[in-house]
């Protein structure tokens, strides 16, 4: 016990961790807060599950048009608990989208987007867009018939935009047609760009909530 106390005192002297702990645990929670105010936190938990299971799958997934489908099949049938890891990833993805939608409704119906919380709302909207992008890019990674045609349709949508439409299509596909470059880009977006972007906006979102507090009742 003496050793653990001395270690604690060493960190306390340098980092003042007790002050941080007191600030986190003593934050005032308004009496009107109920279970529906937990929807944002549940969305965060789903994201963390996504991150963990997605990271585990990168050890087996091969982002090539010739090996993507077979690597997913190998994960599902030959890797110990691989089927469970991928299934949890898919289930938590669906749960994340559902919790996000319910969270948006809760914030809107309780006026959580009003002054002075406009920027908190904006960061939330950006995270909602990123979450949808997660779904689109992840859907294509098995590179089966459903994934391939989903990519072809989604990546072709920007073609309707005047002037820059064709450029955006080629940017998404990595060329004029859907192929290896497309899968590589979607894999990069899904496993690196989108997770880090979402993490940054989540941090901003939580810091704003921490600073401004929870909005009052209607």
Curated annotation (Swiss-Prot):
Transmembrane parts of this sequence: 35-55, 93-113, 119-139, 189-209
Chain residues that bind heme b 2: 89, 190
Domain of life where this protein originates: Bacteria
InterPro entries found in the cross-reference section: Cyt_b/b6_N, Cyt_B6_PetB, Cytb/b6-like_sf, Cytochrome_b_N_euk/bac, Di-haem_cyt_TM
Subcellular location: Cellular thylakoid membrane
Note on how the cofactor is bound: Binds 2 heme b groups non-covalently with two histidine residues as axial ligands. Binds one heme group covalently by a single cysteine link with no axial amino acid ligand. This heme was named heme ci.
Gene Ontology annotations of biological process type: photosynthesis; respiratory electron transport chain
Membrane topology: Multi-pass membrane protein
PROSITE patterns, sorted: CYTB_NTER (PS51002)
UniProt KW Transmembrane helix keyword: yes
Function: Component of the cytochrome b6-f complex, which mediates electron transfer between photosystem II (PSII) and photosystem I (PSI), cyclic electron flow around PSI, and state transitions.
Family: Belongs to the cytochrome b family. PetB subfamily.
Name recorded for this polypeptide: Cytochrome b6
Organism: Prochlorococcus marinus (strain MIT 9301)
Lineage: Bacteria, Bacillati, Cyanobacteriota, Cyanophyceae, Synechococcales
The encoding gene: petB
